[in-house]
């Protein structure tokens, strides 16, 4: 296994700067022993998702923690850290969701929704948030997470954004299946009631030259997927 360098960085997009909106993306990385984990989450731009910037941070935290726990438990039980099927990754995704929902409910309990937060929210969502039964919607976000170990790597993805793999021979590909439900400004989300059914996965036992993950704020800045992946390769080589 080659030695990998992992990094994560998020910046406020130009449109958010113009609209005086906070950065709604979050990213993070974790490294221990020979394991590299990176995650990125993209909050939703609609005014109805009033705490989406917090939701994306919670998603990154939940993903890094859940994946690290999975790898550590696998090693303690002398099991492969890169599963042979998606069954184990579905359990990881359930763990991520549970951790994310716990953070959301704790946040609402500590800091209930304020009138000024709800000023631009539609009447439909105001009623939902007032009922206390739809708190998670306020924190909606996408999520991509990738874990590299000495046995290969795996990825978990819900919503839009891209995962680009650069192979040793210079070939570029998107190894995680695309979700056709994600189109233009519509995306699946970790806050969906059926979110566990919307996760997609990749499991590989080989070692690419590099892996790049990013929110749709990056790939939407390019006129074509080819330009995006080419730029990603240039940046990573």
Q: What does each of the following model-derived ranges do?
A:
Residues 35-46, 157-159, 205-226:
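Conserved beta-strand-loop-short alpha-helix elements that form
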Residues 1-68, 161, 192-202:
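N-terminal entry segment of metal-dependent catalytic domains or homologous docking segments
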Residues 228-237:
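Single conserved hydrophobic/aromatic residue that forms the stacking wall/gate
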Residues 6-21, 114-136, 140, 165-206:
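PP2C/PPM family metal-dependent serine/threonine protein phosphatase catalytic domain
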């Amino acid at each position: 296994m080659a030695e990998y360098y992992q990094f994560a960085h998020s910046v406020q997009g130009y449109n958010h700067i113009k609209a005086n909106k906070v950065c709604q993306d979050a990213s993070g990385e974790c490294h221990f022993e020979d394991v590299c984990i990176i995650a990125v989450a993209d909050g939703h731009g609609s005014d109805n998702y009033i705490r989406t910037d917090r939701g994306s941070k919670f998603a990154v935290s939940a993903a890094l923690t859940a994946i690290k726990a999975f790898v550590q438990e696998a090693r303690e039980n002398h099991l492969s850290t890169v599963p042979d099927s998606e069954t184990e990754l579905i359990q990881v995704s359930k763990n991520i969701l549970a951790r994310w929902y716990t953070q959301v409910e704790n946040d609402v309990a500590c800091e209930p929704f304020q009138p000024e937060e709800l000023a631009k929210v539609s009447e439909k969502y105001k009623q939902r948030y007032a009922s206390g039964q739809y708190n998670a919607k306020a924190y909606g976000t996408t999520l991509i997470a990738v874990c590299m170990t000495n046995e290969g790597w795996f990825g978990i993805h819900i919503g839009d954004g891209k995962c680009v793999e650069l192979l040793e021979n210079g070939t570029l590909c998107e190894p995680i299946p695309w979700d056709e439900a994600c189109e233009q400004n519509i995306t699946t989300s970790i806050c969906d009631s059926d979110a566990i059914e919307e996760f997609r996965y990749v499991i590989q036992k080989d070692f690419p030259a590099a892996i790049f993950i990013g929110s749709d704020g990056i790939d939407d800045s390019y006129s074509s997927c080819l330009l995006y992946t080419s730029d990603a390769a240039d940046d990573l080589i």
